[in-house]
A protein has these predicted regions:
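Catalytic centers of hydrolytic enzymes
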Residues: 1-230
Length: 230
């Protein structure tokens, strides 16, 4: 579902890169004709779609801040991968995660690794843009975000990318006339039938540690609900 939101954001804005987070972990849209209720399930918030200019370095720092909130630093294959709280996940509004899931952004438009053996601020390795060209840390890129994030929500632009909150508005080069949900509806109508596909453009590494750890942590967090898309 997150990758589908990325698809809509990139298609609508013509940005180079998009940032988006999971807005829930317990929503299912069944195959068949989509309803307006399904659209609210897919995107429940009244956010607009914005495009901002960020340097390659700011993009990496943004992602560092995001992943610092939801992965641990693994020192052995037996460690947890996901930052979890000590509350019962079934009764917790963050589904057992230590940080709010709506602040756990991933990126599309780039290919990158998240090395969970590294400490905070040193995990992200951006291998290339989606088209295979190299990301230049000194160059500016057009980045699609929702209006909550563009205003500094979650601190990923301010505490992560290091942009002064007073400067955020000046970084916005385009703001859509409709909510992001409206753009999702337009996208579905234009491209129906929709078969969302995963981008597989990023991964946790080293995979020989992270793959088993992810399975263990999913079971701890969600039990019989099975694996959960992130």
């Amino acid at each position: 579902r997150v990758d589908f939101v990325h698809d809509v954001m990139l298609s609508t804005s013509c940005a180079d890169i998009s940032f988006a987070s999971p807005l829930s972990f317990d929503v299912t849209v069944k195959s068949g004709p989509a309803t307006m209720a399904d659209m609210y399930k897919l995107y429940s918030y009244e956010n607009d779609l914005c495009v901002m200019t960020l340097t390659g370095k700011e993009i990496r720092q943004y992602l560092e801040k995001s992943y610092d909130g939801w992965v641990t630093t693994m020192t052995s294959p037996d460690d947890h991968l996901i930052c979890m709280n000590n509350r019962d996940a079934s009764r917790d509004k963050f589904f057992g995660l230590k940080k709010p899931f709506y602040n756990l952004d991933t990126a599309a438009g780039i290919i990158y690794d998240v090395d969970v053996t590294k400490p905070n601020g040193e995990r992200i390795v951006i291998k290339s843009m989606a088209d295979g060209t190299q990301l230049d840390e000194t160059r500016t890129y057009r980045v699609a975000v929702n209006s909550y994030r563009a205003a500094g929500g979650g601190g990923l632009l301010t505490k992560g990318a290091g942009i002064d909150k007073a400067q955020l508005e000046s970084r916005i080069t385009w703001r859509g006339d409709h909510t992001l949900r409206d753009y999702i509806i337009k996208y579905v109508r234009k491209h129906s039938p929709i078969t969302p596909k995963t981008h597989n453009n990023w991964q946790f590494v080293p995979t020989e540690w992270t793959a088993p750890a992810a399975m263990r942590d999913y079971q701890t967090l969600w039990g019989e609900r099975g694996s959960v898309e992130i």
